[in-house]
């Protein structure tokens, strides 16, 4: 009799699992097929669709809202009420995606396609996968009647990829009470790192570099191109950029990157392991840092970087240029201040005729100290889905909406659930895709993680 009961319950559990997968897939498909690009897309439509999904699972109208700073720029905020055991936890994903042209893809980027073990479509990696997983998980928790110790908030936002109406920034400025939290779990960063099909680690992103661009400009009186002069705006700017290309900012680790190199050095048996451990020391070993700097990813983790990304000059092919400009994009490590970086660029260029002004300023983001309790909880949950996977704090070289939350005093930790092989990164590119198994593994992980965080009392 016990055996029979076991098989009945096992079959029911499998049916429930299949149901949850079907729901998550349907949500994912719906999101992919709503164009949410800045140019012609409609983030509000996607936000309203997700609100309708949550209400169908039992969320009240008062617990799911859609707010927009501008037409087509909607943000959805949903809340599961807890017993008041602490400040809420915020779960964050963005609904907008970068542009995608049909002629660049092998198929329509806004048609959800499953083929050969992959889901295809714009946003499958960045990051409608995570938005779908969060919505599916919140729906499941509501249906199960789960009551957390503190409120759980889900925010799906606009204009993370660009555009004038960044949802997180706007919500913090105008509706902070809706998303204020003890800390945020950001689905746009961190997560399982996989390479060549091998899972390496579960990363918790606790820092990110600040995007900050400068405009370099040289002005000249110009003239007729038949009467050339050595004093040429393009020459002068080129020579200044050549000096910048030979400059390297000093190594500047923070507790997050120091812990990353220390932990990965202990885990890795490869040729870089000894250098990881050496660079994690105080002070970092200079020779080890020099060797690691030869790899773009490690160089970017070790220091602030500045690189020219755009050039313009002249006004006619038969005229000497009166102006030449360059955009230099910098990624600042936490602790490096824009004014100091600007002064260093001016010093390196060494030419008072080259002006340096902020082109796209932003607010530097601090790092978020990672509580031991969060590392341990993430490790336990991760091991339930991917046994034996180590947990490592990390800093990402790109930027996310976590910068606004950290500046506002909300510690933010990137823990993406659906992973992508490092050899198959297609976010922002052609034929974006995610492995079907990775998506469903992420569904399992997010459910376990959100439920565990909602039950835990040790993480402040």
Where are these regions (language model features)?
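Active-site metal-coordination/substrate-binding segment of hydrolases
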Residues: 86-156
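N-terminal hydrophobic or amphipathic helices/low-complexity stretches enriched
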Residues: 15-41, 55-61, 101-104, 208-211
């Amino acid at each position: 009799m016990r055996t029979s009961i076991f098989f009945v319950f096992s079959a029911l559990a499998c049916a429930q699992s299949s149901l949850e997968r079907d729901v998550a897939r349907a949500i994912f498909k719906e999101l992919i097929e709503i164009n949410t690009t800045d140019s012609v897309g409609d983030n509000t439509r996607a936000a309203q669709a997700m609100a309708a999904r949550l209400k169908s699972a039992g969320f009240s109208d008062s617990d799911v809202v859609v707010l927009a700073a501008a037409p087509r720029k909607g943000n959805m905020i949903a809340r599961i009420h807890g017993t008041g055991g602490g400040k809420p936890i915020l779960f964050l994903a963005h609904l907008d995606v970068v542009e995608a042209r049909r002629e660049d893809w092998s198929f329509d980027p806004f048609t959800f396609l499953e083929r050969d073990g992959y889901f295809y479509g714009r946003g499958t990696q960045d990051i409608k996968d995570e938005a779908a997983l969060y919505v599916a998980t919140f729906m499941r928790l509501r249906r199960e009647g789960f009551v957390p110790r503190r409120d759980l908030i889900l925010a799906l936002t606009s204009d993370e990829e660009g555009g004038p109406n960044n949802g997180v920034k706007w919500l913090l400025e105008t509706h902070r009470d809706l998303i204020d939290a003890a800390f945020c779990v950001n689905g746009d960063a961190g997560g399982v790192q996989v390479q060549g099909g091998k899972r390496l680690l579960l990363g918790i992103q606790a820092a990110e570099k600040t995007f900050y661009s400068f405009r370099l400009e040289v002005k000249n009186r110009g003239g007729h191109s038949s009467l050339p002069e050595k004093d040429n705006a393009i020459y002068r700017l080129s020579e200044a950029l050549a000096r910048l290309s030979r400059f390297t900012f000093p190594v500047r680790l923070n507790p997050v990157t120091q812990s990353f190199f220390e932990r990965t050095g202990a885990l890795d048996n490869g040729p870089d392991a000894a250098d990881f451990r050496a660079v994690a020391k105080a002070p970092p070993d200079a020779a080890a840092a020099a060797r690691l700097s030869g790899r773009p990813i490690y160089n970017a983790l070790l220091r602030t970087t500045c690189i020219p990304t755009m050039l313009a000059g002249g006004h006619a092919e038969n005229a000497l240029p009166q102006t030449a400009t360059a955009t230099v994009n910098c990624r600042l490590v936490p602790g490096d201040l824009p004014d100091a970086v600007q002064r260093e660029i001016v010093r390196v260029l060494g030419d008072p005729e080259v002006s340096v002004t902020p082109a796209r300023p932003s607010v530097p983001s601090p790092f978020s100290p990672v509580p031991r309790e969060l590392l341990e909880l993430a490790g336990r949950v991760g091991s339930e889905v991917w046994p034996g996977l180590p947990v490592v704090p990390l800093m990402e070289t790109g930027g996310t909406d976590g910068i606004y939350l950290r500046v506002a005093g909300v510690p933010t930790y990137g823990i993406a659930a659906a992973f992508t092989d490092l050899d198959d990164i297609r976010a922002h590119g052609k034929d974006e895709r995610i492995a079907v198994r990775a998506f469903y593994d992420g569904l399992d992980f997010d459910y376990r993680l959100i439920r565990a965080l909602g039950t835990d009392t040790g993480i402040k």
